[in-house]
Swiss-Prot record:
It is found in: Nucleus; Cytoplasm. Residues 535-544, 578-595, 842-855 have a biased composition (Low complexity). Residues 626-635, 787-797, 856-872, 880-890, 905-915 have a biased composition (Basic and acidic residues). One of its GO terms (cellular component) is cytoplasm. Interacts with SMAD2 and SMAD3. The lineage of its organism: Eukaryota, Metazoa, Chordata, Craniata, Vertebrata. The gene is Skor2. Residues 649-666 have a biased composition (Basic residues). It comes from Mus musculus. GO terms for molecular function: chromatin binding; histone deacetylase binding; sequence-specific double-stranded DNA binding; SMAD binding. Residues 280-315, 514-927 are annotated as: Disordered. Belongs to the SKI family. This is SKI family transcriptional corepressor 2.
Length: 1008
């Protein structure tokens, strides 16, 4: 390394340009190097970066993973691996004990399962090959290595480096016959001398000469050994720099970065990445292409090309994120602004601070351009696996950006989702997106994005985990599953800016997952144009999704048509509803409603729905509650700003809704959150939202009988959708269901009563939260979720099964959104509450949107049955439903209070039509079915989920509207998610099948 003319060892890799890595700096002698004890931890300064070392087998070895994540973070794993192989560096796997030592030393993340250790010399060579000039070793003109091999009878010769100018160069002179051979041929050349003993060639092949050819001198000088290592590394794929202009292009990176100031990619490349990568050749050629970023802003496809795959380090990622934001922003101006803001922050922070400003500008100014850039490549480009290959953003090479177009057509997708960012790139992108301009080292920005979008680190990012926010809807209006990356999505002029993308993505996924995909699709499709702006307004967590929800809800409402609409859609509508619910919270929240809903009546998601579908369904109306996840995000984002007004109207509508929930109540489009909010309203209202009135738990009980009738709307509310996200609730409700069947008439009150205390209590919080939040359901749901989890021990326990199924549904719809995106039930729970809120959500669902949201699915099946009854006898059945709740609440009051009511409400609402049949059935099997119903619910839930999954899968499979799915990663993610859910269902069904199959399955099938 000493030979390499790099800056001092103290230079920080990121801080300085290419010179940052100095050969000399590679390894600074460590004091106490002589007395090495096994597993002794040390530190080696490599190119100015401290690398943890461990004494293994008497040799000090460095953590390759740490080197890859720090010094070589700009290079893809494949690049590093190939180079390591090319250099003949063998990795020694550390033992579990050593791995733990490395973890505690901070070299490895706690989640790491293995770590390769390489010697200090090997680490220096590896880093030098990437960071140093790739120039052949300086050797005397007439120098030759005395080499020999032991293949066959063996042979000895002189390897003349001066002649080694290609992989096939005849540079080895046989010392026996004086003929010249190429290294590959020489190992097959041997003379059978009398004293030669035959040695099996040991898999000697045309490319194994580096293994078989050894220096004849058994103890050569270090300089000789190092020179030999360097020579062997020549013409070995790994060390071959890309055919880009040489590292000198580094300066180009800067201009590039300047150009990309708007484009973003060069920032990192220029500052930290440029220098580092420039030497890698990738930096040099790319700079010219990066300038196109400006063009990209203008809409130049090339620029688009460039920006997406900027390899720059953090800035690159940040800028990419900005770009992504800009692209999305093209869809949503507000988003573009946000992108600009976020991008600028990180960019400034990062090495490409200068670029950042440009980036910010590019984000806002180039929003349209970004959109245009999306256009250039609407098909996913799947570059050779390389850290950078996944996207310039991912690749930290300034130059690499040019080499590989971003796999995701829109830069934003990569940046926003940190999908393919290499190790830390994701973090950078996230930071950029978040606008966390902590790019001082660029590492900070990276970390930000990674954490923002998902916990995965850069390496994980390389194979990105499922999107944590739901993929925004595609241009076609088709929702993108949560686990699908939506590279083309940006192309869709959706307002899927990074800011809103989480919600939007969630919504998209929800729509996709919705069984009522047609409705969801149609609904989603129209709003995309409208939602983008609204979505843009979304901070990126809840609001955008909310907007999506509104549209989605409307869609759902419209497709279902009458009061039976939600239910009529069958399991499909419920899924849609559940989906809508998930997004609904957001829509009920800040103006997302307007976005998503055909009518951009931000405050009144329900209203928007009303407009969307003249006789929208209550479930639709409550879907916003269902969208608790979004609501929660919104609540967090917006505090309790808009929630109160919303909740008030919702409450009223809710109360009106409740009575007619099973009937379409187009005029009652207040968001479910609203419905939840008005717990203190009239007793009837309370009945609608008994839980919502925490202050008057008794009143809710009193109204409960009355509310039971209202509860029936719960069935109308599209219990199915709730089923999606309300698996937990379903489980808990399953118990309720049994009770419901046992004493529906009386228990409704009791159930309300039993559940009310907790529900009310939680509801109080949630109500407050919801009220506080424009999406009343949002914050409250969040709380409810927590409450549900705490309070609904049973609910959550069943969730073990129920929640799991819920996860299945959700994973397709809300769960992925909620569980992944929201990490809590807030997302998940959101869907059930919407329908729930109208009837019981206010009392239980509303009170405990979180729990209900998430339990509707669990309770949904029972709801399903009950709902059938409620369909015919809405009020009576509702009463029964209430009883159900009451019973369950009594049984599991601690959690059922919220969850149960939530789930039941959903069920009644959505399943009301279907519940009629089961009312008597339920009553008969009150006790007997308690367990069975739970299982049945789970099974039905699974069945419904399967339907939705199939639907979603079909959509994903053959829909041109989802160009995103052309992406290999998307496909893999899709398949993985599908398989995962299949497995989960398989786990659940056997347990539920035995009990459910007999009666419940038949009943369920007859219902559905």
């Amino acid at each position: 390394m000493a030979s390499s003319p790099l800056p001092g060892p103290n230079d920080i890799l990121l801080a300085s340009p290419s010179s940052a890595f100095q050969p000399d700096a590679l390894s600074q002698p460590r004091p106490g190097h002589a007395n090495l004890k096994p597993n002794q931890v040390g530190q080696v300064i490599l190119y100015g970066i401290p690398i943890v070392s461990l004494v293994i087998d008497g040799q000090e070895r460095l953590c390759l993973a740490q080197i890859s994540n720090t010094l070589l973070k700009n290079f893809s794993y494949n690049e590093i691996h190939n180079r390591r192989v090319a250099l003949g560096i063998t990795c020694v796997q550390c033992t579990p004990v050593q791995l733990e030592i490395l973890r505690r030393a901070g070299a490895m993340p706690i989640s790491s399962r293995r770590c390769g250790m390489i010697t200090k010399r090997e680490a220096e060579r590896l880093c030098k090959s990437f960071l140093g000039e790739n120039r052949p070793p300086k050797l005397p003109d007439n120098f030759a290595f005395d080499v020999s091999h032991e293949c066959a009878w063996g042979c000895r010769g002189s390897f003349i480096p001066a002649r080694y100018n290609s992989s096939r160069a005849k540079c080895i002179k046989c010392s026996y016959c004086n003929m010249y051979f190429s290294p590959n041929k020489f190992i097959f050349h041997s003379h059978r001398t009398p004293d030669a003993k035959y040695t099996q060639p040991d898999a000697a092949n045309f490319n194994s000469w580096r293994r078989h050819l050894k220096l004849t001198d058994k103890s050569p000088q270090d300089e000789l050994v190092f020179a030999w290592e360097d020579v062997k590394a020549m013409f070995n794929g790994g060390s071959r720099k890309r055919a880009l202009p040489q590292p000198s292009a580094h300066p180009a990176c800067h201009p590039l970065s300047s150009v990309k100031a708007a484009a973003v990619a060069a920032a990192a490349a220029v500052a930290g990445g440029g220098g580092l990568l420039g030497p890698h050749l990738l930096g040099a050629p790319p700079p010219p292409p990066p300038p196109p970023p400006l063009a990209e802003l203008a809409g130049a496809p090339h620029a688009h090309h460039k920006r997406p795959r900027f390899d720059d380090d953090d800035d690159s990622l940040q800028e990419a994120a900005v770009v992504a934001a800009a692209s999305l922003s093209a869809a949503a101006a507000s988003l573009s602004v946000a992108a600009a803001t976020g991008g600028a922050g990180p960019g400034a922070g990062g090495p490409g601070g200068g670029c950042v400003a440009g980036v910010g500008v590019g984000a806002s100014a180039g929003a349209g351009a970004a959109a245009g850039t999306k256009g250039p490549r609407s098909y996913p480009v799947i570059p050779v696996p390389s850290k950078g290959s996944f996207g310039g953003v991912l690749q930290k090479f300034p130059g690499c950006g040019g080499l590989f177009p971003h796999p995701y057509t829109f830069p934003a997708a990569a940046a926003a989702f940190g999908l393919c960012h290499k190790k830390e790139d994701a973090g950078t992108a996230a930071e950029a997106l978040g606008g966390a301009g902590a790019g001082s080292a660029g590492a900070a920005p990276k970390a930000g994005l990674s954490g923002l979008f998902w916990p995965a680190g850069r390496k994980d990012a390389f194979y990105p985990p499922f999107c944590m926010f739901w993929p925004p809807r595609t241009p076609g209006g088709l929702p993108v599953p949560t686990y699908l990356q939506p590279p083309p999505q940006p192309p869709s002029a959706l307002g899927c800016a990074l800011g809103d993308s989480p919600a939007l993505l969630r919504q998209a996924f929800l729509d996709l997952a919705e069984p009522g995909g047609a409705g969801g699709s149609a609904e989603a499709a129209p709003p995309p144009g409208q939602p983008p702006p609204v979505v843009a307004n979304g901070p990126g967590s809840g609001p955008p999704a909310t907007g999506g929800t509104g549209a989605r809800d409307t869609l759902f409402e419209s497709p279902p048509g009458g009061s039976g609409g939600d239910c009529s859609a069958g399991s499909t509508p419920p899924a849609e509803q559940g989906v809508t619910s998930g997004t609904g919270s957001a829509s009920s929240g800040a103006g997302s409603v307007g976005t998503r809903v055909p009518a951009p009546h931000h405050p009144h998601l329900l209203e928007g729905r009303k407009a969307g579908g003249g006789s929208y369904h209550h479930s639709s109306a409550f879907r916003p509650v269902g969208g608790k996840d979004d609501a929660e995000s919104l609540a967090k984002l917006h505090g309790a700003s808009a929630g109160t007004p919303h909740s008030a109207p919702a409450h009223h509508h809710h109360h009106h809704h409740h009575p007619h929930h099973h009937h379409h109540h187009p005029p009652q489009p207040p968001s479910p959150l609203l419905l939840l909010q008005p717990q203190p309203d009239e007793p009837g209202s309370e009945r609608h939202h008994p839980a919502p009135p925490p202050p008057p738990p008794p009143p809710p009980l009193a109204p409960q009988p009355h509310h039971r009738g209202l509860l029936s709307p719960e069935g109308t509310s599209c219990s199915y959708p709730s089923e999606d996200s309300s698996e937990d609730e379903e489980d808990e409700e399953e118990e309720q269901e049994v009770d419901v069947e046992g004493h529906k008439p009386l228990e409704g009150e009791e159930e309300e009563d039993g559940r009310d205390p907790e529900d009310e209590e939680e509801e109080d919080e949630e109500t407050r939260v919801l009220l506080g939040d424009s999406l009343v359901g949002g914050g409250r749901f969040l709380q409810g979720r927590g409450l549900s989890e705490k309070g609904s021990g049973r609910d959550r326990t069943t969730p073990a099964v129920g929640a799991f199924p819920l996860a299945l549904n959700s994973s397709r719809l809300l769960q992925e959104d909620g569980k992944l995106g929201d990490s809590g039930g807030s997302d998940l729970p959101a869907p059930p509450p919407p329908p729930l809120a109208p009837q019981k959500a206010s009392s239980s669902g509303g009170s405990r949107p979180g729990s209900p949201v998430h339990h509707p699915s669990l309770e949904e099946e029972p709801s399903y049955k009950d709902n059938q009854k409620p369909k015919e006898n809405n009020q009576v059945i509702i009463s029964t439903k209430d009883d159900n709740f009451s019973d369950k609440n009594k049984g599991h009051g601690f959690f059922i209070t919220d969850s149960d009511s939530s789930g039941d409400f959903w069920r009644e609402r959505s399943g009301e039509h279907t519940q009629e049949t089961n009312s008597p059935h339920s009553l008969k099997k009150d006790v007997e079915n308690m367990g069975k119903e739970e299982l049945q619910k789970v099974l039905f839930e699974q069945i419904d989920l399967r339907r939705r999954l199939e639907q979603e899968f079909q959509v994903l499979k053959g829909n041109t509207s989802f160009p995103v799915f052309n992406n290999f990663q998307d496909q893999m993610k899709r398949e993985l998610a599908y398989r995962e859910e299949m497995v989960q269902q398989l786990q659940i069904i056997p347990y539920a099948a035995s009990l459910i199959r007999k009666e419940k399955l038949g009943a369920h099938l007859s219902k559905s």
